[in-house]
């Protein structure tokens, strides 16, 4: 059985926050932010928008694109680090919003690697033969956990959501190879402060980890797929920082024009990062049926996930 993406959808909130916004209360500038991160603007959800609301908008599009109805969904997996509340899960809340059957629901917390973790998890369930249409969502409202007094992190984060329906696809298409991993020793470098409820990051250590693991994991999944770098049509890394992305691209040996860059528009949206990039490239006609994509993410934990996927239903 070939398992892949049967339907796709993404959503970014309407509010655009450009770099000039931060100049009024932080010692920073548009020039510095752009040079160091590649970010020009990001989207922030409104105060009355929860993560589940972002997930709902993306999910409706994915279900429609798959040519099915909510009644056909037989599992929901949401990757998020910013649930509406500790429980019930975002997946549970999303089930009600979509009015699906009483199917199993779960959230997966692997921070920015969450979308990769959830897609790989869904693949296993479909491969078992017990499930046919699994809704996987990467959604985060990072604006609610961003410390706006911290110059090093305040400018980085945005909000958004992306969703896919994972199921059986045509011969020769779908997920070809994948890898997941974690290193709990790095948990202290990127975490949510339990007292303040705000994100804390050791940028230098996270940068070192990300540069190494994104390149290594991407290379391994390409090798596992029996492919060469020349066989890759599009490289879609987690959109954390343009310098990290460029380093990973160089390690993989991919031409610059084959790398998706959406960090300039959305900032770091955690679990939504990779699907928002996919959405951009689909809109621009840069992803076509039977294209070979490499997706790779890293995040708090520290965690990582990568895959090679042949695009198409």
Curated annotation (Swiss-Prot):
The keyword Acyltransferase applies. Homodimer. Residues 239-243 are annotated as: ACP-binding. This is Beta-ketoacyl-[acyl-carrier-protein] synthase III. It catalyses: malonyl-[ACP] + acetyl-CoA + H(+) = 3-oxobutanoyl-[ACP] + CO2 + CoA. SUPFAM superfamilies: Thiolase-like. The active site is at 112, 238, 268. NCBIfam families: fabH, PRK09352.1. Its main location: cytoplasm. Keywords: Acyltransferase, Cytoplasm, Fatty acid biosynthesis, Fatty acid metabolism, Lipid biosynthesis, Lipid metabolism, Multifunctional enzyme, Transferase. It comes from the Bacteria. Catalyzes the condensation reaction of fatty acid synthesis by the addition to an acyl acceptor of two carbons from malonyl-ACP. Catalyzes the first condensation reaction which initiates fatty acid synthesis and may therefore play a role in governing the total rate of fatty acid production. Possesses both acetoacetyl-ACP synthase and acetyl transacylase activities. Its substrate specificity determines the biosynthesis of branched-chain and/or straight-chain of fatty acids. Its EC number is 2.3.1.180. It comes from Staphylococcus haemolyticus (strain JCSC1435). The lineage of its organism: Bacteria, Bacillati, Bacillota, Bacilli, Bacillales. GO terms for cellular component: cytoplasm. Belongs to the thiolase-like superfamily. FabH family. The last Arg residue of the ACP-binding site is essential for the weak association between ACP/AcpP and FabH. Pathway: Lipid metabolism; fatty acid biosynthesis. One of its GO terms (biological process) is fatty acid biosynthetic process.
């Amino acid at each position: 059985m070939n398992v892949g993406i049967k339907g796709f959808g993404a959503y970014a909130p309407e509010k655009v926050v450009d770099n000039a916004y931060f100049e009024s209360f932080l010692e920073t500038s548009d020039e510095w932010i752009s040079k160091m991160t590649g970010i020009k603007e990001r989207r922030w959800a409104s105060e009355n928008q929860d993560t589940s609301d972002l997930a709902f908008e993306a999910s409706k599009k994915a279900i429609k694109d798959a040519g099915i109805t909510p009644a056909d969904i037989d599992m929901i997996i949401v990757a998020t680090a910013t649930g509406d509340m500790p429980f019930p899960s975002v997946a549970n809340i999303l089930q009600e919003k979509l009015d699906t059957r009483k199917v199993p629901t779960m959230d997966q917390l692997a921070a920015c690697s969450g979308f990769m973790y959830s897609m790989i998890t869904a693949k296993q369930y479909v491969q078992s033969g017990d499930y046919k249409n699994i809704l996987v969502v990467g959604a985060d409202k990072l604006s609610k956990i961003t410390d706006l007094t911290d110059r090093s992190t305040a400018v980085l984060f945005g909000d958004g959501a992306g969703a896919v329906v994972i199921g059986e696809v045509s011969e020769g298409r779908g997920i070809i190879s994948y890898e997941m991993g974690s290193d709990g020793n790095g948990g202290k470098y990127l975490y949510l402060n339990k007292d303040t409820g705000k994100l804390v990051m050791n940028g230098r250590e996270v940068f070192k980890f990300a540069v190494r693991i994104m390149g290594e994991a991407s290379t391994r999944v390409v090798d596992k797929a029996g492919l060469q770098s020349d066989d890759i049509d599009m490289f879609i890394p987690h959109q954390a920082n343009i310098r990290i992305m460029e380093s990973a691209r160089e390690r993989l040996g991919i031409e610059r024009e084959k790398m998706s860059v959406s960090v300039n528009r959305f900032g770091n949206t955690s679990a939504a990062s990779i699907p928002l990039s996919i959405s951009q490239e689909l809109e621009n006609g840069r992803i076509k049926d039977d294209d070979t994509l490499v997706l790779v993410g890293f995040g708090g934990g520290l965690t990582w996930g990568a895959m090679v996927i042949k695009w198409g239903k």
